[in-house]
């Protein structure tokens, strides 16, 4: 899946680069878009929680009116968890960052891992 996200002035650090914290927001938007497209949003039977997230910054993103493109795909599916991998692309299509998020499916009451639906 590909999602375009507009950079905000508030995303910038004093050097004019997109701050590393903003990448987490971008990844969350892309993750929720992917989960929604897969019709796997949270319901009363299960919830998805982030277990880990790793971002490798390749090159700085600077402010631009053109959106950042986030490419996402699901990988590494297990019984109670899965990973989403991302590529963050600048306005030229160059890779600015690569990331992975590991999510677990849990019972919303107990918080314990459960088998994926």
Located regions from the model:
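Intrinsically disordered, low-complexity segments enriched in small/polar residues
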Residues: 21-24, 55, 80, 84
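HotDog/MaoC-like acyl-thioester-processing domains
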Residues: 1-3, 62-64, 75-117
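Hot-dog-fold acyl-thioester-processing enzymes
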Residues: 1-52, 108-117
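Hydrophobic beta-strand-centered segment that forms part of the acyl-chain substrate-binding groove
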Residues: 34-69, 73-78, 96-98
């Amino acid at each position: 899946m590909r999602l375009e996200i507009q950079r905000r002035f508030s995303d910038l650090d004093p050097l004019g680069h997109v701050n590393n914290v903003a990448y987490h927001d971008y990844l969350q938007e892309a993750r929720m878009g992917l989960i929604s497209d897969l019709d796997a949003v949270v319901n009363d039977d299960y919830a998805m929680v982030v277990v880990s997230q790793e971002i490798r910054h390749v090159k700085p993103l600077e402010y631009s009116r053109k959106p950042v493109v986030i490419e996402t795909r699901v990988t590494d599916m297990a019984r109670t968890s899965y990973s989403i991998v991302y590529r963050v692309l600048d306005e030229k299509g160059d890779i600015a960052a690569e990331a992975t998020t590991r999510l677990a499916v849990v019972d919303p009451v107990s918080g314990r891992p459960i088998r994926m639906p």
